[in-house]
Amino acid sequence: MREPKLGAVVGKKGVGKSYTTLKLMGQYVGGSQQAKPRRVLILDVNDEYENIKAISLTDVAKFSMHPKVEVRRIRPYQPDGTRMTLRDFSDALFTILEHFKGGLLLIEDINKYVSDSLPNDLIGAICTNRHRDLDIIMHFQSIGRITPKIWQNLNWLRFHKNSDSVDRHKKKFEDK
């Protein structure tokens, strides 16, 4: 049985985090001889994945069970067309973590809507995704923004060009 993975991608804006992750998502949805195809869901807080079909937050459970394997995204808008607030993004992430399973979740720009002191229940939900057969990738602008609990649970880290000095954080890498 496969073990779900928790990954982090770190780098400043415009260095290819989303581009590289999109290529990975294509492989994920396509599958291989070793791995069956799996669906992908993006929490698109910046509305930047315009080439990917959107779904409503209320349809996440249906998407999770649908036989068609594809990439979909949650746009940063309420059903009435107003932009989601920072609290709405946090609530949306809870909803996704509760209902989406058997795929890959990309949490884009997580520091935009979650403060330096992430709620413990949200971090716990992200870190205990194994029971949902859910792989998670989180995009961060800075390596220093990854919380200790997330560091402890990471399976992998992809590092892009960054303005942070890694020397400040090198002790975090000792077991990675």
Predicted regions and their residues:
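Terminal domain-start segments
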Residues: 39, 73-76, 87-92
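Intrinsically disordered, low-complexity coil segments
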Residues: 29-36, 77-87
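Walker A/P-loop NTP-binding active-site region of P-loop NTPases
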Residues: 15-61
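Conserved P-loop NTPase motor cores
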Residues: 7-26, 83-175
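Conserved P-loop NTPase mechanochemical-coupling segment
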Residues: 62-84
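Hydrophobic/aromatic beta-strand patches that form the interior of the parallel beta-sheet core
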Residues: 7, 41-43, 55, 72, ...
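Structural alpha-beta junctions
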Residues: 32-36, 54-68, 95-101, 132
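Pre-Walker A (Motif I) flank of P-loop NTPase domains
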Residues: 2-8, 38
